[in-house]
Amino acid sequence: MAKGPNNAARARKKVKKNVADGIAHVHASFNNTIITITDRQGNALSWATAGGQGFKGSRKSTPFAAQVAAENAGRVAQDQGIKNLEVRIKGPGPGRESAVRALNALGIKIAIIEDVTPIPHNGCRPPKRRRI
C-alpha cells in the first residue's frame, strides 16, 4: 500500500521577500473574485479568493466578499514589503470596484488602475440567454 507524502516534506517555509512595487491582478467573474498580488516579474506574493474567505454560493459574488479577499491579500503583500501597486482588473463581476477600494484603504499607494478584460473580436459564440 502506497503512503502519501509526509507533512515534513510538504510544508515549506515561506520566504519573506522585500518587494516595494507590485501588480494586483483582480479577476472578477460573476461567481467569484480572485485577487493575486505579484511582483513586477509576475511572481506571486499573495493571493486570496472570495470563496477562500468562507463565502459560499451566491455570497461569493458580492462586493463585500471581494473586499474581504482584497484586504487579506493586501495584508500578506504588505508583510512582503509592498508599498506601491498597479491594479489590473479583468472581468465583469460585482467585486471589481470594492476590491480596489479595499486595497487603497490598507494604505497601499495605487499608481495605475487598468482594465484588461478580454474583449473578443467576434470570437466564440456566447452562452445562450438565461430563462428564469
UniProtKB/Swiss-Prot annotation:
Keyword Coiled coil in record: no
Top-level taxon: Bacteria
Single GO BP term: translation
InterPro entries linked: Ribosomal_uS11, Ribosomal_uS11_bac-type, Ribosomal_uS11_CS, Ribosomal_uS11_sf
GO cellular component terms given for this protein: ribonucleoprotein complex; ribosome
Function in brief: Located on the platform of the 30S subunit, it bridges several disparate RNA helices of the 16S rRNA. Forms part of the Shine-Dalgarno cleft in the 70S ribosome.
Name of the protein in its database record: Small ribosomal subunit protein uS11
Organism: Cupriavidus necator (strain ATCC 17699 / DSM 428 / KCTC 22496 / NCIMB 10442 / H16 / Stanier 337)
